[in-house]
Structures are given as C-alpha cells and as structure tokens.
C-alpha cells in the first residue's frame, strides 16, 4: 500500500487533441495549462492504483524519484500511462491483469473526463507493456461505458463487462485489485445510467481519439478481443477432490464460515480469488466448482463488510486502508482525525485531515501497548472537538482493532472481555493477534492498578457493574446515582434498605473489609481481617432499651426503633466515615470510613421519595451507643479513627474565616449553592458563630411560642464526616421515630440563618435534627417569628471579635465529633458539660433559660434528659412538652455523671490534641502566619500544638518516632500530610480544658447585646478548670475502658 503523487507533463497528444477539438471554448487553453501543472496522487495496492481526489494540494505532492518501496513497478507504469492521455483526461483507476504471455504486463485503465454539461464520462482502456521494465506503452482496447453496461463475476477470479453487444473478461492479479475495480466500475455505470449515455449520442465522442491511438501488437489486440475465450492461467482444482460428493445447503454454510476465516488470515493484495477457492477446497476436502458463483458473491460480501468502516462509538470509526483512502466517504461521515496504525500505509490526505501515526507491523512481537496512551489522547481530542476519528490499519482486523479495544477499556473502565466483545459485535472481523491479546491483558492490569491508586482510595466500591464516570462523583450528579447506590428503593416496607438488612431478608453478618478485598465477603474469617458488628451491638441494644425514658415511648410508635435509631449508627459510621488504616488490628474501619468522607453532605437535592427511603435506612443504621468490644480494639479504633488523613479537597478556610461583615443570609446563600465545588468534609466552626449552642438554647426557649416550622423555614444540612447522608424531605407517619421536641426546636430555628456546616455540633445532633426536619414538615406552618434571626445577627457581630479565644473551643468540639465515632462521646460530652457548669463571670447569662438548656443541646446517645443536675429543675419547670410528646426527668443522669469523673483533663487534652481531619489541623504545616507559629495568650502556636498531637499519638499507639514517620510519608502522598521539622520536637503543652473554659465564658458573654467580658487570665482559668491528672497517660487500663 502506497501513496504516490505524479506530475502531469506536456505530451505529444496535446497538440493533436487541441486540433481535433477546435470546437471547445476559448477558455479551455487556460484549463489545459492548469492541468499541466497539477499533481495527481494515487492510492496504490498491489496490482491497482486508485486516483485520489486531492487536486493540487501542495501537502500531498511527492517526488517520483523516491517511490514507495511497497508500490513495486506500478508508479513507473502509471507515469507512462498518464503521459499517454490528453491533458483534460484523468485516470480514475488502473488495475493490473493476468496475461497469457509471461513477459507482458496488461492494465485495465478507467479514464474519465468532464463532458459538455460538466457530467462525468468514463471509458475503459486496455494498455500493454512489452515488459516490466518498459518505458513505453500502447493502447490495445477502447470500451465505452454506456448506460446498458452490466458487470458479472465469472466465478474464476475475474469479472466480465458487457455493453452495446460487446463483452470482455478481466482477471485482476489480486482480490484487493478486483475489489477496487468492481467499486469504481459500479459507480461509473451508475453515472452512465443516470445521464443516459447511449451509442450515437453526443456523449463519449472523445473516445474516438483513443481509438485512433490503438497501436499494440496484433497478438495483444487479439488477447483483448478474445477475452471471452481466454482460459485462466491458474491451475485447476486438484484432481484429488474431483469425485467428492457435495450437499448444497450444508456445504454453503461451511463455505461461509471457512471463507471468512481464510480471507481474514490472507493478504488480499497477494492472492487471487482462485487461490482462496483452492484453499477453501483443501480445508473442506471437497470440490467446489459448482459453488464458484456462490463463493465469489460471499467473497464480495465479506470484502464489502471489511471495506465499510465500523462505527464503534459516536466519535470513533474502525476501518481499513480502503476507508482511509475514500475521501468522499470520510467527508460524508464527518471524520476529521485519522489514526494510522501501520508502517506500510501512507497518510493519503495530509492537507485535509489531522493524522497521527503509530508505525508498527502486524506481528506478535510488536510493542503496541506503548502507543495506546497517545492514541487515547488523540481520539479524545477528536471527541472534545465534536468531530470523529477513523482508526485504521491495513484491514481493520488486528492492529487498529486492538487499539480501539484498549481505548474502550481506558475510556469506559471496561474489562478486557467486555471491551473485546463490544468491538467484535460492532465489527465482526475483529481479531487481534496473540501478541496483542497478551498486551491487552497486561493493559487491563495496568488500568486496574491505576484505578486502585486514584479512584478506589477515596470512592465507595460500586455495587454494580455500571461504569463510574468521573462526573458521577460531583455534587451535581450524586443525586442521579442514588438509584444505583440503593438497590431496593422501591421496596415499600423498607425502602433504601438492602435485602440482606431488611427484616425479611437473610441475616448476613455485617463486616468490615480490607482495602485489598475487592468485594464484601461475609464468609472471610481470617484473624484481624473482618470485624463482626453483631456482638458489638447486642449490649448496646439492651442498654439503650433499658435506659430510654417512658415518655419517649409515647412519642415513638415502635419502641424498639428508638434504640435502633442510635444502635445502627456505629455500623454506618465505621463503614463510611474513615480514611486510612492506623494499625493492623482494624484496617477495615479506616478503609471503609474513607469511602464515605468525600460524599459527606452532598445529598441536598434528593426527591421526597428518595429521601424518605434514605431516612428509613438511616434510622436502621444509627448507633451511637456503647460497644461491648475488647479494650484494645476500642483503643485502636479510637486512635486509628482520630488519626485519619483527610482527602485533599478544597480547603475549608473560607468556611471557617469569612468576613465578619457578612450577614447570616449571605452565608446561607453561599452554602446552599448546589454547584459549589468547595465541600467541607468536617464541621467547620466560624469564629463569630461558635456560640451556636447558645443559639440552639435561645431557640429552644421559644419552643412554646412556635410549635412547628414548615418546610419553607428549613434548609438542608451539611453533615459532618461520619454522618452518611442528610435526610431533608418529609416522610410518612411512622416511617421513622420522631425525635424529641428538645432537639426539634433548635434545628428549626437555626437552620434558617446559619450555614449548614455550622448548625450542629456533633454527629448525633445531626442525625436527630435531620429526623426532626422530616417530622417538622408534616405539621402546619404557623407565622414565622423573626426574633431568633435578629438575635443570631447579634451573635454574628459580637463573636466576630474573639476568633482567638474561640479557636480552642472549636478544636475541642471537633474532637467530640471524632470521639463519637469511636464510641466515646458519652464520657467526653459529660466532661464538657461538667466543665461548662462551673461558675463563670456572667451569672446573668446563666440565669437565662437558654443558658440552662445549653447542655441539653448536646444529647447523649438517644437520651433526652438534661445533662447537668444543677440545671434540671429550671429546665424541667420552664420547658413544657410540645404536643404532649416529651417530659424530662431531672435525675436520670446522676449515676452517669459520677462515672465520667474518672476522666481527667489531661486525658481530654490528649484526645483533643489528637489530630483530626479538620481544616485547622490539615493546614498547619502550610501556614506561615504569626498565629500558627507564635504563642497566643501564653499558649503555644498551632504548629507547636500539632507537634504535641503527633508525639502524643505516637506514644499512645506504642510506636517509635521512625516507624510512623515512614508510614506518614506514604500517607502524605495521598492525603497531603506534610511533616515539618517542628513536628517531631515540641514541648509539653498546657491543658486545653482551660481553653474550652475560656471559650465557654466567651460564649456566655457573647449572648448579651454588647461584648462585656474582658479577656481572662489563662492561669486563673486553668485553676478554676480543675485537676490535672498526668497519671491518665500512665494508666492504659483506664484508657481502654474509655
């Protein structure tokens, strides 16, 4: 296969042509001169040359002195034949034919010109060369193609052309040459029929010039005129198979199957149809003379299928060299990009199309895999430009087909088998050689490894075989993926709940899987591998059912679900909340937790039906209760979860430190933008909204004034990491246990003004408040009370002046969220409540009923009683049941408060300083501000704090400095966790409980109309905050019990 460009030159026939056609217009001289300078490019196969409709494109010109090495002597013969023509005539096709004389070379040439009415007129010329090295040729036959021209296959490797009573038989030297001749002749006959060319008319008069030029030897002329009596020079079928019987239909079916296999394995440029038939007879072991016509027709059918490019995708064609040379077809199909996967085939139209060459041969040892990446980008370039790309090799069977299969595997994430079957279905002759199949298998492993690195680390494992496009994981498209992630949404009894978890389904154990496990396999039971949750939850179920107040049973239709609301949360959080394995004892917890982190807070626009399903699933998977697991397991889970690395999403600094002059409505609009790309995976606490627990309390004090809030007054939540999905839309009665009104009211009030990431201070509040949103929407909506929003604006302006004081409280409250994942939130919350109940500088704020209910806004694993006994009487007297659904018991938490006194502030300091995935800790090493480096109010800067965190974590995990340092460097590649030189050398820090006490007092004062509290002495605060128990770090048993 070659592309050869020849230059037209003046010929002796030009003068005679001009004299014999003096009736032509005067402008024909200019046209003739233009034709003399035109280059003519030909698409060449062995035995045939097809003119390319390229005109005088300068990019396509080539020098004849350097013919293509695969073109043979055809370019020289073609140049001689061009010089034989008139200047206005063109060669459309030249096909080499067999001859009875071994030293002679014969060509059937299709010559065309533009007629009087700019119509195409075609004739056939028989051209003879005395030898292969001859520099001259003669014309031995001229055949006009009239409108009655008919073409038939002779069944012996040739075809006959009959017109106006004359018939000639032509036998091309190869199947490919015959196929090219048949296509060109078919189009020429169509033109003759359309314009009704008939003998005696004005058409084809110019053929008389060539008839006058017939000058071949008489033996050659006789050969052209006696073609109907010419026997093929090929040997007949072997006599061995002459007497074998045949069975019609059965034989035809075998012929179809074997003929396709033979043609796909043969070089059609170097074999004839007779040779293919002989090979077919050998394989079928029978004589096929009576099936010659059937074989030729099937051969043409197969050639037609191989000739037509196959549309694999909307932007991708797979074809052969013939398709790459068919300009009309390329332009008609909208192809602008051509990927040439051959070494022996040229680019035919370099001035018209964008080409990319992969110069390889079709051999098993060829390294095609190295080129698939560049081929992928080239094809996608055509896709991005809304165009189409043709990928071709010689036949469109092996090299180009392998490239298209590799493209499908990478573009759509398909396995090799699926991609191969898909391309095979679109183009049935697809058959990569054995070497390319091995490379495709290797390429599949490379792509799988790449998915493990880049996709599966931060993505939930898909539950089906659908292709996961990158856009499916954006916030805008996650709603559309809801049906795929929740297979049983249309289950009316338990919507959104997998069958294995539904009450009627099989009771499969819920396990955690390793990062290397491709599927969730319940039957795996290796040591340290799978952690079954059933035993961890039985005690929690019993304990929660016993401790639940009687009044709550009045509210919840199904008493058992009140405990399940909290019970299943551990499973959900451990399954979807964490990021990295901390130790070998619990690798699955962090691996499954990291899958959920990127998706936190992205389910804002789900429909009512889907959210009702999600709500039921959430209620069946909530578990904040205590876990009866071994002490070492709980400790490892605690410190493994707290040390997880956050995926590198957009920083939450904008959420944490916006401008102080912004209004609550401005923050509301900014956080509710569904197209926003900044997704906070952790709850962020603005400096001027750190008093949101007080805002909760103030709204709770107004609960009797406003019994319920309609859906218009609520807004979606952005849940913290550890929460799975927010439940915003309403659900039917009884779909989920309705939470107590003490949590319902604050969520209603604050959701209107606060950003979604600031409304709730721990995951348990998130769950309950989200459920209360649902129940709130079922109630009628009274007139909105504008007073809470006004107070909140006051809070915004007051607290904007104390970012330093409240930053430590932010860290403390974020640690609550992380501790709750490990099942330690009860003790930590009690300690915080006990600290907040100590005397403060603002008694007026404490006397306010809102302050008295501050602790109640931090609930305790499903129990709705007040947290501190000193505030119970006032809370119980002022807070009336809403709709008769809630009554508080002021004494139910006294035993639990005594239990939490074992925890010292040093231990809480250790936990509080344990690194979390908040935006503060993740940005420490990248911060160069004075707040991060220098001390603030006698306390070390954030960099020193982080050094303290890292050293504390290493000591409690029983590790040396070098071992986690190496591990952290590997984690840094994925989670942007960078170590500085100060990370490993830090002095002991003071207790952070004093910080939280300072922040608490600042909160109380900020609730007043004017900021009245002056900065307090940190030393004095430390004294008032109570004891310091360094022995807590020395006592691992007490840590284990926590």
Curated annotation (Swiss-Prot):
This is Protein phosphatase Slingshot homolog 1. Keywords: Acetylation, Actin-binding, Cytoplasm, Cytoskeleton, Hydrolase, Phosphoprotein, Protein phosphatase. It comes from Mus musculus (Mouse). InterPro entries: DEK_C, DSP_SSH1, Dual-sp_phosphatase_cat-dom, Phosphatase_SSH-like, Prot-tyrosine_phosphatase-like, SSH-N, Tyr_Pase_AS, Tyr_Pase_dom. Belongs to the protein-tyrosine phosphatase family. Protein phosphatase which regulates actin filament dynamics. Dephosphorylates and activates the actin binding/depolymerizing factor cofilin, which subsequently binds to actin filaments and stimulates their disassembly. Inhibitory phosphorylation of cofilin is mediated by LIMK1, which may also be dephosphorylated and inactivated by this protein. The keyword Transcription regulation does not apply. The active site is at residue 393. The gene is Ssh1. Interacts with the 14-3-3 proteins YWHAB, YWHAG, YWHAQ, and YWHAZ. Interaction with 14-3-3 proteins inhibits phosphatase activity and also blocks recruitment to lamellipodia and stimulation by actin. Interacts with actin and this stimulates phosphatase activity. Interacts with LIMK1. Residues 249-304 form the DEK-C domain. Residues 13-22, 697-712, 917-935 have a biased composition (Low complexity). Pfam families: DEK_C, DSPc, PH_SSH1-like_1st. The modification Phosphoserine is found at residues 37, 57, 516, 889, 970. The lineage of its organism: Eukaryota, Metazoa, Chordata, Craniata, Vertebrata.
């Amino acid at each position: 296969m070659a592309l050869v460009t020849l230059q037209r030159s003046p010929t002796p026939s030009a003068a005679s042509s001009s004299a014999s056609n003096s009736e032509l217009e005067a402008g024909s001289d200019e046209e003739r001169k233009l034709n003399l300078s035109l280059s003519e490019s030909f698409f060449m196969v062995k035995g045939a040359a097809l003119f390319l409709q390229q005109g005088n494109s300068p990019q396509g010109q080539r020098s004849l002195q350097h013919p293509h090495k695969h073109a043979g002597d055809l370019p020289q013969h073609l140049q001689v034949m061009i010089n034989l023509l008139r200047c206005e005539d063109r060669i459309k096709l030249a096909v080499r034919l067999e001859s009875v004389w071994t030293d002679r070379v014969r060509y059937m040439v299709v010559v065309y010109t533009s007629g009087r009415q700019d119509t195409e007129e075609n004739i056939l010329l028989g051209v003879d060369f005395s030898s292969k090295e001859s520099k001259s040729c003669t014309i031995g036959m001229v055949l006009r193609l009239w409108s009655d021209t008919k073409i038939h296959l002779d069944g012996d490797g040739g075809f006959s052309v009959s017109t106006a009573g004359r018939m000639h038989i032509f036998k091309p030297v190869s199947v490919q040459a015959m196929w090219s001749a048949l296509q060109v002749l078919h189009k020429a006959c169509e033109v003759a029929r359309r314009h009704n060319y008939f003998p005696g008319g004005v058409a084809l008069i110019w053929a008389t010039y060539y008839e006058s030029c017939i000058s071949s030897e008489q033996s050659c002329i006789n050969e052209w005129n006696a073609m109907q009596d010419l026997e093929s020079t090929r040997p007949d079928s072997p006599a061995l198979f002459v007497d074998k019987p045949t069975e019609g239909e059965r034989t035809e079916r075998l012929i179809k199957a074997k003929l396709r296999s033979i043609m796909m394995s043969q070089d059609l440029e170097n074999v004839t149809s007779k040779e293919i038939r002989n090979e077919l007879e050998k394989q079928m072991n029978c004589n096929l003379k009576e099936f010659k016509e059937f074989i030729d027709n099937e051969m043409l059918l197969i050639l037609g299928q191989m000739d037509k490019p196959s549309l694999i995708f909307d932007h991708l064609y797979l074809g052969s060299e013939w398709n790459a040379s068919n300009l009309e077809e390329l332009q008609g199909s909208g192809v602008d990009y051509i990927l040439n996967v051959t070494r022996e085939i040229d680019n035919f139209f370099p001035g018209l199309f964008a080409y990319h060459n992969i110069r390889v041969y079709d051999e098993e040892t060829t390294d095609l895999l190295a080129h698939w990446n560049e081929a992928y980008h080239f094809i996608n370039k055509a896709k991005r430009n809304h165009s189409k790309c043709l990928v071709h090799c010689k036949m469109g069977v092996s090299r180009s087909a392998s490239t298209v299969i590799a493209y499908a595997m990478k573009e759509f994430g398909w396995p090799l088998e699926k991609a191969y079957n898909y391309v095979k279905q679109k183009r049935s002759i697809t058959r990569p050689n054995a070497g390319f199949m091995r490379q495709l298998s290797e390429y599949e492993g490379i792509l799988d490894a790449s998915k493990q690195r880049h996709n599966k680390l931060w993505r939930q494992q898909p539950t089906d075989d659908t292709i996961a496009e990158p856009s499916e994981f954006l916030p805008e498209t996650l709603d559309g993926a809801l049906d795929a992630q929740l297979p049983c949404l249309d289950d009316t009894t338990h919507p959104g709940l997998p069958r294995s978890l539904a009450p009627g389904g099989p009771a499969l154990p819920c396990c955690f899987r390793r990062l290397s496990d491709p599927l969730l396999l319940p039957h795996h039971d290796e040591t340290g591998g799978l952690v079954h949750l059933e035993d961890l939850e039985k005690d929690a179920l019993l304990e929660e059912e016993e401790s639940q107040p009687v009044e709550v049973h009045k509210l919840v239709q199904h008493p058992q679900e009140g405990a399940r609301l909290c019970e299943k949360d551990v499973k959900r959080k451990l399954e979807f909340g964490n990021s990295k394995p901390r130790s070998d004892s619990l690798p699955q917890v962090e691996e499954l937790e990291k899958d959920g982190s990127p998706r936190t807070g992205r389910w804002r626009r789900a429909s009512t039906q889907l959210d009702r399903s999600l709500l039921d699933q959430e209620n069946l998977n909530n578990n904040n209760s205590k876990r009866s697991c071994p002490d070492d397991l709980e400790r490892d889970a605690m410190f493994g979860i707290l040390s997880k690395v956050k995926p590198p999403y957009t920083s939450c600094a904008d959420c944490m430190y916006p401008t102080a002059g912004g209004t609550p409505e401005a923050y509301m609009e900014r956080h509710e933008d569904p197209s926003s790309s900044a997704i906070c995976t952790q709850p962020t606490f603005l400096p001027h909204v750190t008093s949101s627990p007080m805002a909760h309390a103030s709204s709770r004090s107004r609960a009797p004034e406003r019994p319920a809030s309609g859906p218009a007054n609520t807004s979606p939540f952005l849940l913290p990491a550890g929460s799975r999905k927010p439940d915003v839309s309403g659900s039917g009665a009884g779909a989920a246990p309705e939470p107590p009104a003490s949590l319902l009211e604050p969520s209603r009030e604050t959701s209107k003004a606060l950003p979604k990431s600031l409304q709730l201070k721990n995951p348990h509040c998130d769950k309950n408040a989200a459920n209360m949103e649902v129940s709130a929407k079922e109630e009628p909506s009274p007139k909105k009370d504008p007073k809470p929003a006004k107070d909140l604006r006051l809070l915004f302006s007051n607290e904007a002046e104390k970012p330093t004081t409240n930053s430590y409280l932010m860290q403390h409250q974020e640690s609550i969220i992380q501790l709750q994942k490990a099942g330690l939130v009860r003790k930590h919350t009690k300690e915080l409540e006990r600290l907040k109940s100590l005397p403060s500088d603002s008694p007026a704020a404490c006397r306010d009923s809102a302050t008295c209910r501050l602790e109640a806004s931090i609930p305790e694993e499903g129990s709705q009683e007040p947290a501190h006994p000193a505030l119970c009487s006032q809370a119980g007297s002022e807070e009336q049941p809403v709709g008769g659904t809630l009554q508080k018991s002021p004494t139910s938490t006294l035993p639990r408060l005594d239990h939490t006194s074992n925890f010292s502030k040093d231990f809480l300091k250790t936990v509080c300083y344990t690194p979390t995935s908040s935006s503060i800790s993740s940005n420490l090493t990248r911060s160069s501000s004075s707040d991060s480096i220098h001390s603030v109010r006698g306390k070390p800067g954030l960099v020193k704090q982080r050094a303290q965190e890292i050293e504390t974590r290493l000591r409690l995990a029983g590790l040396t400095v070098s071992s986690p340092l190496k591990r952290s460097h590997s984690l840094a590649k994925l989670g942007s966790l960078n170590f500085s030189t100060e990370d490993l050398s830090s002095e002991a820090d003071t207790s952070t409980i004093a910080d939280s006490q300072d922040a608490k007092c600042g909160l109380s004062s900020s609730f007043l109309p004017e900021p009245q509290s002056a900065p307090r002495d940190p030393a004095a605060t430390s004294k008032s905050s109570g004891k310091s128990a360094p022995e807590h770090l020395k006592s691992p048993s007490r840590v284990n019990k926590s």
